[in-house]
Amino acid sequence: VRLKDKIAIVTGASSDIGLEISKKFVEEGAKVILLGRRIDKLEQARKTIPEYSSKTSAMACDLTNEAQVIQTVNQIMDHYGKIDILVNNAGTITDPIHFHEMQDKDLNSLVDTNLFGTFRITKSVLIKMLENKNGGNIINIGSISAERAIPKVHLTVYCTTKAAINMFTKGLAVEYARKNIRCNCINPGIVNAGMIKSYLDYPEARKVLEDRQPINKIGQPEDVANAAVYLASDEAKWISGTILNVDGGKSASEG
């Protein structure tokens, strides 16, 4: 049990990677607060976690609303007394369109959720970690698209927000190292989650995606969750500022 008695917040926790991280954290002894925009989805997801009633709670929180973020973090502190781990998994993506065709609303949605939303929740949690003086652990969930543009898929702004998260990770790691607060980032590759799920229903599309992976298969949410457990644990106590690609070798390949 690697996360015994730890209190963890996981954003974007109602499905896929966020939910799988929440499950793995509970298995390892943590109590987990699942955050997302819709409480009905969160409660439904929460009930798939063993011992969910005693090991988890769900709270609706819109990360684009600063007042709501602050209020949510305060409520968590009032109930649990500490926050040991924050997993910034929440994010959004637009339909693939050329950059010059994007409207301001598209730009604002991407940047406000993927960047400023992450900034808001991290800032609020950091304040509590610093007040408690017991250190802490922040894990950002990014994407290998932070490091390479995606051919034939027009996601320039999305890729840019993920690249910014990489630098945010490194900056936090250095700035708060002396406060015993670690920060790392996991960059998943092609994982059976989100928009990718719909493509995998078609055998031809699945084969194309699998053939592009050096390890000839699609990643699963649990692959990312296992990495998150490791980074959250004391086994990784001397790891901070690291960008961990969980992508079956994709980022090391040419294709």
Give a label for each model feature.
Residues I127, V174-R178, K237:
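Alpha-helical segment proximal to the catalytic Tyr-Lys
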Residues Q213-V224:
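A conserved structural motif in NAD(P)-dependent oxidoreductases
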